């Protein structure tokens, strides 16, 4: 049985005395990466490892330097009684560009073109390895907008929106095509889809977004922007604030959206 497992079972900090620094840092990294943007008090690590705060701070500094060196994100320290440390999953620079180029190459495969001029994307949208990284890239692009909620519409935009919400550590809200009795009173709007030019309905429960909430809209595909405009109207009907719109793929035409 590993030393860390023994510690967790015994609940005693002194059993961690034999744990090497590299083992502590691996465990710290796992705990932080599993909860993006969640503020974890330093005392939590002190109790978990049975170490002094100064030692924990030194370990966290090494973790931060390593993450930044390899462009895997960074650690943000918040001072004060209610402070702590949180992992910010930045994806930018060379790593972000490599990820986007890989996705672009897959989308440009000739056999992806389907009748109607559409691109088959489902295998990419449901690839969690890809969606996790794209979610972190989008989070990095919109981090300065400080959204309170991530909003999408069912169904294909959900996987990407889930990973954006995870990267931000913010609630995900999903607009439906029809209202559900189990969700209480709702607001519904009609909008014109850009892909087919048909009038469709989307609905959102009134409890989903409070007034003055900052909302980031996420979707998988944009042609004329009808769906995004519909989502924006829903947010405005609920007295929310749209801080941005992020999509995985947007057609060149029509322009503007």
Tell what function each PLM region has.
Residues 3-217, 224-257:
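PRPP-associated nucleotide enzymes
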